[in-house]
């Protein structure tokens, strides 16, 4: 397979899916998500564009499954040119004094612990000229966002630290902040928002590919 490999964790919908489609003209896509049906739909759309993908329907919480995936990637392709992590758990908005412990624990697991385990497992697949991209979301860092905001901030701090550590050696680590888009996460937070006023997910994905020269 002549195309370089792009690993998209959280590829079943939203920005992850649109990035996968936008990148499929120049990359072989490894699409990771829990939802098999959504991954199969993504695969169909990529094929219609003349691209190719490998589907990995796994839960990122499952460390053994992720380790097996990384080993399989190494055995087949040897390296990953691009890693985009878009997977996120969005706990409901609410006052700090009513924080639910289950929402907190699930958010810590999915948004912080998963990333803390992913980076050590994926990084051996990344070379000096590889790229990894993560996504900031300060548009929701306001009141009532304590659980989501805290875990998202922790996630980004991990990435910033890794970014500093890789400045002289590679890979290149990017932290991007797309404009507000009509994603399922945003709809959960702002159900009454006029989604027509938000930026197209497809356009934001294409803009990221262009700006970051992915």
Which residues does each predicted region cover?
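Conserved glycine-rich Rossmann-like NAD(P)H-binding loop of the short-chain dehydrogenase/reductase
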Residues: 26-41
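Catalytic loop of short-chain dehydrogenase/reductase
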Residues: 88-89, 116, 124, 129-168, ...
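Catalytic Tyr-X3-Lys loop
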Residues: 97-116, 133, 155
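Conserved glycine-rich cofactor-binding loop
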Residues: 10-13
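Amphipathic alpha-helical dimer-interface segment in Rossmann-like NAD(P)H-dependent oxidoreductases
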Residues: 22, 71, 75, 110-130, ...
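C-terminal helical subdomain
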Residues: 168-171, 175-177, 183, 191-214
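Conserved mid-core segment of classical short-chain dehydrogenase/reductases
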Residues: 67, 88-105
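Rossmann-fold cofactor-recognition segment
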Residues: 48-63
């Amino acid at each position: 397979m002549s195309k370089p490999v792009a690993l998209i964790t959280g590829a079943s919908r939203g920005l992850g899916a649109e990035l996968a489609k936008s990148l499929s003209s120049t990359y072989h896509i490894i699409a990771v998500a829990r939802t098999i049906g959504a991954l199969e739909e993504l695969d169909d759309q990529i094929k219609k564009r003349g691209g190719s993908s490998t589907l990995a329907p796994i839960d990122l919480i499952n460390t053994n499954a992720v380790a097996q995936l990384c080993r399989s990637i190494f055995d087949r392709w040897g390296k990953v040119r691009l890693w985009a992590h878009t997977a996120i758990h969005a706990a409901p908005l609410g006052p700090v004094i009513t924080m639910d412990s289950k929402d907190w624990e699930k958010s810590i697991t999915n948004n912080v612990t998963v990333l803390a385990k992913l980076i050590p497992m994926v990084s051996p697949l990344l070379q000096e000229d590889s790229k990894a991209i993560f996504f900031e979301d300060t548009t929701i860092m306001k009141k009532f966002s304590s659980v989501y905001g805290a875990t998202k901030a922790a996630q980004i701090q991990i990435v910033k630290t890794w970014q500093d550590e890789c400045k002289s050696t590679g890979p290149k680590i990017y932290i991007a902040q797309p404009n507000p888009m009509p994603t399922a996460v945003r709809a959960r937070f702002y159900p009454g928002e006029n989604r027509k006023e938000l930026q197209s997910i497809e356009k934001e994905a294409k803009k990221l590919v262009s700006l970051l020269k992915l």
